[in-house]
Structures are given as C-alpha cells and as structure tokens.
Amino acid sequence: MKTTLALSMATLLISSSAFAADFSATKDKLETALAADIRTDKEVARDRNRKPVRTLEFFGFRDDMKVVELMPGGGWYTKLLAPVVADKGQYYMAIGTSRASKAVAGQAGFDKVKVTAEEAKIYRPEGSKFYALEADGLGVSDMDMVLTFRNYHNFSESGRAVMNKMAFDALKSGGVYAVVDHTRRHMQATDNENRRRFDPVLAIKEIQAAGFKFVDMTDLHYKPDDELRYEVGRKSVTGNSDRWTLKFVKP
C-alpha cells in the first residue's frame, strides 16, 4: 500500500513538473509577444486587467498547439497567440476577422496566420438585439484549442448553438474550448444594461448540451466592485467588469 502510494505521489510530482516545464517555454514566448512593438499603448494598458499569461496557462495553452480564435475583434489576443504558436503549432482566426486580419497584415512574425470559415455569416435580424450566425463549420479539424473572449453574449440562442457546434466539430478528442465573457446574474431577464453580459450557468448548460464536458473555472477575472447592474461600456465599468472564465473539453 505504501509502495503504491509512493509511486502515485511520484507520478503526480513528475506530471506537475512536466506541466510547469511545458508552460515555461510557452510563457517565455508570451512575454516576448507582450513586449512586441506591434502592440499599441491601449492594448498594453489592458494587460493588467486581462491577465493573458495566467488566463492562457489556466486553459492549458501551449506553443505547439493548433488553435482557433473565434471573433478576434481588433486582434488583442491574436497578437499574443499567433507568434507563440508560429514555429511549432498553427493559429487560425474565424468569424468576424476583418479588423484582426488588418491589424497583423504584413507584420513580421504573422505571415503564418490563417483565416478560416470565411463563408460564415453574422447578421442581426430585424428587431433583434442579438446576432444570428450561419456557417457549415470552421473548415478545420483536429484542433487542440478553440478560444473566444467576450463574444458569447453577442449571439442569439440559435447563434450560440451554431458557434458551440462549430467549436466541437473542429476540436480533437481532448481538445479545449476556452470561453470568457462578462457576468450577468443568474436567470436575470435581458435589458439594455445587461445585454452585453451573460449568465455563466446558462453558458455551461448550453455548452454541455453541445457535447462538451465542463472541467474547470477560475476567478482570475472576478471583480467584487462590479455590481453586475450596469452596461459594460459605461465609464465606471469598462476595464473593471466581472468576467467568467470557463474551460471545457471535448470527450
């Protein structure tokens, strides 16, 4: 019994050490990306709030992964993810990629960035506060990770279902679906103040319904001063919104 326990502990320690060593190389590359000239002063100013290194470590991001970022916005995370995986992995951006593509076009170290699911359509139906999403898939498979930051709230229920299915189909077994968004109170009805927030319990329910296993969450982006009452774009809330950070795995 003691021998078995000792062996188990030794295995755990070795695994933990290997995990730390694996991320050490990735962390070094992330630190280099964080210091790169391509990043604007406004982007750098958000580092303290967004905690990208710790967030990506939580998700299990590594420099040899094939990753897809959904709706990369202006490319804040693109400028960190793409150079880290450039040598040993692959970065794809998908859905609403025009601003991010423009931000890194022609820049040294970003020539391997690929755009996928270019046929995807995002539109807001007349009278709706949320976007619809039409797409056959992400156009890639066997991915290690699909990430999306502060986008889940933008879509209608059917749009979210499409997005979750796209992520599921693109990932390999064991692949990670990493999702971050602004927190809304559980079961709170939608209004103009919370429209860009989302209930994390509902997110978990929907993503599990797509076939994913919910494996972990972190309070890295917990903000006790956010009353969850006001629009995230308000001056008093911007940069200080409470955000849920959820990790799912494809079985």
List each language-model region with its residue ranges.
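Conserved Class I S-adenosyl-L-methionine
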Residues: 190-217
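A short acidic, Gly/Pro-enriched loop at the edge of an enzyme's catalytic core
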Residues: 136-146
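Class I SAM-dependent methyltransferase Rossmann-like catalytic core
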Residues: 26-63, 76
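Conserved beta-strand signature within the Rossmann-like core of class I S-adenosyl-L-methionine
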Residues: 91-94, 174-186
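A short glycine-rich, Lys/Arg-flanked "PGG" loop and its adjoining helix->strand segment in the class I
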Residues: 82-83, 161-174
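A short, conserved alpha-helix within the catalytic core of class I
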Residues: 130-133, 154-167
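Core SAM-dependent methyltransferase catalytic element
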Residues: 210, 225-251
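Conserved class I S-adenosyl-L-methionine
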Residues: 63-73
